[in-house]
């Protein structure tokens, strides 16, 4: 009797789902920092409720891959979103030391949700790469011509289609929300409402997985230099190299010196006087002032040279005048009367 009373006190599956879904909606519009205590408490609470809901779904065996989407009751379609909600809440956990674990766990939740929707043919989409289908994807890509260009074009087209579908789904959901939540909608509208939610979360999950893969790559690339430095530090240290001097540089230093100018210790005159004092230089090596006779002889020679130059100029002038006269007075110019 006590056990049955405890079971009645436990929250039921609809309550777990609606409470956790409401917590996620509150977190989506919250203005507080994601790392605040209030936000993280709601994240932990939502994950705890969804974990219980997932356990109940597993015990009830509510979904089976052997059945079609039409065989699932309309009211039970919403429980297919449990893994997607788990992935969304896991992404909101803030712990830098466990960020990689959170990303990998969130990716597993999103993949689980997408796999279920793919099996039930909720919408047409391509499953992201996983460990199970990675070999098939690699084989298909290797057989394609220009795989990078084709993959980029297909991804771009898929994003455009998802964006269009997202706008259409959100518009249709806003039209059905009030009727379904108030209980006035019939089974057909309820079914359409939850199918639209599933398609909306398919687009969200695909976008989140792309973002997760990029962040995981960044985190792994950031940790790889640390691992390399740790491996290098574990290697035994080599003895330091001894300095050596090149023979060429040593010989060059002997010829040209050390490469910097030496400072003078005396002037040239001081050096000359010092050598003359010790008899290291002959007397004729020192210039003496000229004598008076030498000056007179030099002056006479200079005067004679000037006189010779003047005589040469006069003689040259006479010769030029004589040449000019011969040009104007040809031979026989003065004896014209005796011409026969």
From Swiss-Prot:
The keyword Phosphoprotein applies. GO terms for molecular function: enzyme binding; mitogen-activated protein kinase kinase binding; protein domain specific binding; protein phosphatase 2A binding; protein phosphatase regulator activity; protein-containing complex binding. InterPro entries: TAP42/TAP46-like_sf (IPR038511), TAP46-like (IPR007304). Residues 302-312 have a biased composition (Acidic residues). The keyword Cytoplasm applies. Phosphorylated. Keywords: Acetylation, B-cell activation, Chaperone, Cytoplasm, Phosphoprotein, Ubl conjugation. Its main location: cytoplasm. It is found in: Cytoplasm. GO terms for cellular component: cytoplasm; cytosol; microtubule. Residues 313-330 have a biased composition (Basic and acidic residues). The modification N6-acetyllysine is found at residue 242. GO terms for biological process: B cell activation; intracellular signal transduction; negative regulation of apoptotic signaling pathway; negative regulation of stress-activated MAPK cascade; negative regulation of transcription by RNA polymerase II; positive regulation of dephosphorylation; positive regulation of transcription by RNA polymerase II; regulation of dephosphorylation. It holds the Pfam family TAP42. The record marks 256-257 as: Cleavage. Residues 47-61 form the UIM domain. Residues 99-203 are annotated as: Interaction with PPP2CA. Residues 221-242, 281-340 are annotated as: Disordered. Associated to surface IgM-receptor; may be involved in signal transduction. Involved in regulation of the catalytic activity of the phosphatases PP2A, PP4 and PP6 by protecting their partially folded catalytic subunits from degradative polyubiquitination until they associate with regulatory subunits. The UIM domain is required for protective effect on PP2A. Interacts with partially folded PPP2CA, but not with the fully active protein. Interacts with PPP2CB, and with PP4 and PP6. Interacts with MID1 and MID2. Interacts with ubiquitin. Belongs to the IGBP1/TAP42 family. This is Immunoglobulin-binding protein 1. It comes from Rattus norvegicus. The gene is Igbp1.
């Amino acid at each position: 009797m006590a056990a049955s009373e405890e079971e009645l006190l436990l929250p039921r599956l609809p309550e777990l789902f609606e409470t956790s879904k409401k917590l996620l909606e509150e977190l989506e519009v919250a203005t507080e920092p994601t790392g605040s205590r209030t936000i993280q408490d709601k994240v932990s609470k939502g994950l705890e409720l969804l974990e219980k809901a997932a356990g109940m779904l597993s015990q009830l065996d509510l979904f089976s891959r052997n059945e079609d989407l039409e065989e699932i009751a309309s009211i039970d379609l919403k429980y297919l979103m449990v893994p997607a909600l788990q992935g969304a809440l896991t992404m909101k956990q803030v712990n830098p030391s466990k960020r990689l674990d959170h990303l990998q766990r969130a990716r597993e939740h999103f993949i689980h949700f997408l796999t279920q929707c793919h099996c039930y043919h909720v919408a047409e989409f391509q499953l992201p790469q996983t460990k199970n289908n990675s070999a098939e994807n690699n084989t298909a890509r290797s057989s394609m011509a220009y795989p990078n260009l084709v993959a980029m074009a297909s991804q771009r087209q898929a994003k455009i289609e998802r964006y269009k579908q997202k706008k259409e789904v959100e518009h249709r959901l806003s039209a059905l929300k009030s009727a379904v939540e108030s209980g006035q909608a019939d089974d057909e509208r309820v079914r359409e409402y939850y199918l639209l939610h599933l398609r909306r979360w398919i687009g969200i999950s695909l976008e989140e997985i792309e973002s997760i893969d990029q962040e995981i790559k960044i985190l792994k690339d950031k940790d790889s230099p640390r691992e390399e430095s740790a491996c290098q530090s574990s290697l035994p240290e080599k003895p330091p190299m001894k300095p050596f001097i090149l023979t060429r540089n040593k010989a060059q230093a002997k010829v040209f010196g050390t490469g910097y100018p030496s400072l003078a210790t005396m002037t040239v005159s001081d050096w000359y006087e010092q050598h003359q004092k010790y008899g290291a230089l002959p007397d004729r090596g020192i210039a003496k002032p000229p004598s008076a006779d030498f000056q007179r002889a030099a002056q006479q020679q200079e005067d004679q040279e000037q006189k010779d130059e003047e005589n040469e100029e006069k003689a040259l002038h006479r010769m030029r005048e004589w040449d000019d006269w011969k040009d104007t007075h040809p031979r026989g110019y003065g004896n014209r009367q005796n011409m026969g």
